[in-house]
Amino acid sequence: LSARVGRQVISWGESLFFQGISGAQNYADAAAANSPGTQVKEIFLPTGAAYFNLEMTPSINIEAYYQYEWKETKEAGVGSYWSNSDISGDGSERILFVVEDLGLIIPAPVTNGEDPSDNGQWGVALRYFMESGTEFGLYRLRYHDKFPSFVGVADSTATGPLARLPVQLLRHYEEGMDMYGASFSTLVGDVNIVGELSYVPNSVVTQQVLPVLDPTTGRYENGKIQDGHVTQGNLGLFYVWGKTPVADSINLLGEAVYVSTDMDEDDILNDDDAYGYALTADFNYNSVMSGVDLAVKTSFKHAVDGSWKTLTLTDSAKEGSLGLQATYLKRWKGDIKYSRFWGAKSINNKQDRDNITVTVQYSF
């Protein structure tokens, strides 16, 4: 039996570019996910937890954890470069509603509801390792939502056009969500194939920002959050191509994702199903000069159909990047990368966010 206690990232499943099972376990830096080619393991942040791993036999492991801390995903601050909402992220204060009947713009404050408990988040896993190198995993998780939902709070005294507007917008995080999952990892020739399937019977699929009219009383009531069944599948591959005429080695990584819900599309936040894929290819050049290795890094992502916020899928949106990375003596690392976003017309909030980034790292 091995154990560790403290702030840590616990990552189960096999997701690469699209959050799956591991996304329920960890809160994340959502702004970092806006950089094309970023893997989910690069955006997760550590949470306080006790983790245990028991080797039952050489081929069977049981894992379990209990989190004693809850933290929400860090979204881009309102008005910052990557922000696409005035109600979510640090600095969110109010939302403005236009009342055309009266020619007015009415502000409503955005307020925080009660945060989920630091307790009540846990998971158990059963892993089976075959002699051939194939691995299977089964998972059961209980977690609190890391992304907020919003509901409108009605003014019971208001009449006329103002009655349908909220007096405040309440930020809410759903508690006690359940996940059931399975994963596999295997080799087919020289290609590593991985995949996972997850099912959440009580995922947040709809939120009502505006108060809702009760036909029996004729009054507007607070908006509601509705749960639904959500199923998600991820399938990925990893392949290292050895010496070629164009590079000393080429690392290929790809993943496709599909997600669906049983709710009617007209009633939910996202589409009733969505799918897309992401690819990266790194061309590596060793010792181009004394102590210096170079890598040309490329990425491409395409939301083929449907939108799903937590998977950063926007219907028909595309993004890609081209970069150069230099490593000196395995300690210094410098990157320059150009990123471009296009497609999806008016619903793609990143269309005007093309950028060039330069980073320098030192390891010791």
Predicted regions and their residues:
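Extracellular loop and loop/strand-boundary signature of outer-membrane beta-barrel proteins
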Residues: 34-38, 80, 103, 108-112, ...
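Short loop/turn motifs that connect adjacent beta-strands in outer-membrane beta-barrel proteins
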Residues: 1-4, 12-16, 59-62, 75, ...
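Membrane-embedded beta-strand positions of outer-membrane beta-barrel proteins
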Residues: 3-5, 52, 64, 126, ...
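Outer-membrane beta-barrel translocator domains and adjoining extracellular loop/strand segments
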Residues: 15-22, 75-81, 107, 149-155, ...
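Outer membrane beta-barrel
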Residues: 1-88, 305, 315-317, 339-343
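Outer-membrane beta-barrel "beta-signal"
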Residues: 352-364
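Transmembrane beta-strands of outer-membrane beta-barrel pores
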Residues: 7-11, 66-72, 140-146, 188-190, ...
